């Protein structure tokens, strides 16, 4: 099985080199530091949980390497509004927007459009391998960034977290196994995403989250990611003590993503 993650990271480095020729780091950093205040990503999650509800980070995702195109009529602003409204009772706490172009058919403009259409905090979902992308994330309007432990060494994670927090962004650090979790716990961020999908072979099991939960200190907030498709999945994870969920694929195939979200978390 070819290592998908290595391929993605190689492409990311090429993209960054090209981007820096168009917009040097100094310019992107200036744009990032000039942005107005961020929306409170962590606060939005904790508010839902404190009220006894599941905190849902709803994903705006056109395609994936494993499933191909998920949604042909892909209008990020409409999708974001649908998530924000839900069914009037249950709705998204935050958004996650894919900005990777080559593998997920995402884009920076999609994040801007989604954020402009609602009041929800927005996570930039991409494969960050360079500080340039952290500044770029804030410059495009992201309120939070994803740092994937499998893509970064300890020094990079610490450095990129410091940059993100200095810009007012929340950091969701993503892990898949116990070794990655131990590394993630060295960071300051309380937001720990457990990806139920192994990024090296794209196999999925929600057991990944259940296995790691007991290792999480009480001051950290677990966010389960990937493979959450049924109400049974949600019930199993909630029974295990999970309160925050990042879900995309299950909603992207629905006519009204917000209604699909509400139905899954009833």
Curated annotation (Swiss-Prot):
Transmembrane segments: none annotated. Pathway: Amino-acid biosynthesis; L-tryptophan biosynthesis; L-tryptophan from chorismate: step 4/5. GO terms for biological process: L-tryptophan biosynthetic process. SUPFAM superfamilies: Ribulose-phoshate binding barrel (SSF51366). It comes from the Bacteria. Keywords: Amino-acid biosynthesis, Aromatic amino acid biosynthesis, Decarboxylase, Lyase, Tryptophan biosynthesis. GO terms for molecular function: indole-3-glycerol-phosphate synthase activity; phosphoribosylanthranilate isomerase activity. Its EC number is 4.1.1.48. CDD domains: IGPS (cd00331). Coiled coil: none annotated. InterPro entries: Aldolase_TIM, Indole-3-glycerol_P_synth, Indole-3-glycerol_P_synth_dom, Indole-3-GlycerolPSynthase_CS, RibuloseP-bd_barrel. Pfam families: IGPS (PF00218). Gene3D superfamilies: Aldolase class I. It catalyses: 1-(2-carboxyphenylamino)-1-deoxy-D-ribulose 5-phosphate + H(+) = (1S,2R)-1-C-(indol-3-yl)glycerol 3-phosphate + CO2 + H2O. It is an enzyme of class 4 (lyase). NCBIfam families: PRK00278.1-6, PRK00278.2-4. Belongs to the TrpC family. This is Indole-3-glycerol phosphate synthase. The lineage of its organism: Bacteria, Pseudomonadati, Pseudomonadota, Betaproteobacteria, Burkholderiales.
């Amino acid at each position: 099985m070819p290592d998908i993650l290595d391929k993605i990271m190689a492409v990311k480095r090429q993209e960054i080199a090209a981007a820096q020729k168009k917009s040097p780091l100094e310019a992107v950093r200036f744009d990032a530091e000039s942005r107005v205040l961020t929306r409170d990503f962590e606060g939005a999650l904790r508010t839902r949980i404190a009220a006894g509800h599941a905190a849902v980070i709803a994903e705006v995702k056109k395609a994936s390497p494993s499933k191909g195109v998920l949604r042909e009529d892909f209008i990020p602003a409409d999708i974001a509004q649908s998530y924000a409204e839900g069914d009037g009772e249950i709705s998204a706490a935050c958004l996650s927007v894919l900005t990777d172009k080559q593998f997920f058919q995402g884009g920076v403009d999609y994040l801007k459009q989604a954020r402009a259409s609602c009041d929800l905090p927005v996570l930039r979902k991409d494969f960050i391998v360079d500080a340039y992308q952290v500044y770029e994330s804030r410059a495009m309007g992201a309120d939070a960034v994803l740092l994937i432990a499998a893509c970064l060494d300890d020094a990079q994670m610490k450095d990129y977290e410091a940059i993100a927090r200095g810009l007012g962004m929340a950091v969701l650090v993503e892990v898949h196994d116990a070794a990655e979790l131990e590394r993630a716990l060295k960071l300051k961020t309380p937001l720990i995403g457990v990806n139920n999908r192994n990024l090296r072979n794209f196999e999925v099991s929600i057991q990944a989250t259940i296995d790691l939960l007991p290792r999480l200190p009480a001051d950290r907030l677990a966010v389960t990611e990937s493979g959450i498709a049924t109400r049974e999945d949600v019930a199993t994870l909630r029974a295990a003590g999970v309160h925050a969920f990042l879900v995309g694929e299950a909603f992207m195939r629905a006519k009204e993503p917000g209604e699909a979200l509400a139905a899954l978390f009833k």
